[in-house]
């Protein structure tokens, strides 16, 4: 579980990132969760954009992504979700 200080630190790191995944009309599926889990292992911190044509609520999408990829939700702002998962092999971010 992330503390408030750690979330603030990760939000500042994520500010300059661009979303690398988009959740659209199809919603969240197993293939997308697998790809997000692989991206989290490589990058540790990613942004996911929820498109307007997505039929699911953005909070439900965030919850599904967190459960499926076993990551932690840093922030949901607008239609953008920020996820963090500590990498096992190539750790880049040192939390305060």
From Swiss-Prot:
Residue span, CRM domain: 1-96
Pfam families tied to this protein: CRS1_YhbY
Entry-linked Gene3D superfamilies: YhbY-like
Record keywords: RNA-binding
Gene Ontology terms for molecular function: RNA binding
SUPFAM superfamilies for this protein: YhbY-like (SSF75471)
InterPro entries xrefs: RNA-binding_CRM (IPR001890), RNA-binding_domain (IPR051925), RNA-binding_YhbY (IPR017924), YhbY-like_sf (IPR035920)
Superkingdom per UniProt: Bacteria
NCBIfam families with a match to the protein in the record: RNA_bind_YhbY
Descriptive protein name: Probable RNA-binding protein YqeI
């Amino acid at each position: 579980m992330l503390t408030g200080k750690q979330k603030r630190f990760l939000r500042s790191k994520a500010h300059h990132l661009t979303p690398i995944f988009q959740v659209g009309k199809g919603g969240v599926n197993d293939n997308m969760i697998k790809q997000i889990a692989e991206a989290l292992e490589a990058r540790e911190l990613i942004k996911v954009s929820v498109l307007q044509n997505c039929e699911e609520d953005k909070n439900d999408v965030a919850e599904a992504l967190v459960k499926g990829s076993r990551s932690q939700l840093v922030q949901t702002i607008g239609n953008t979700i920020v996820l963090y998962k500590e990498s096992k092999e190539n750790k880049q971010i040192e939390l305060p």
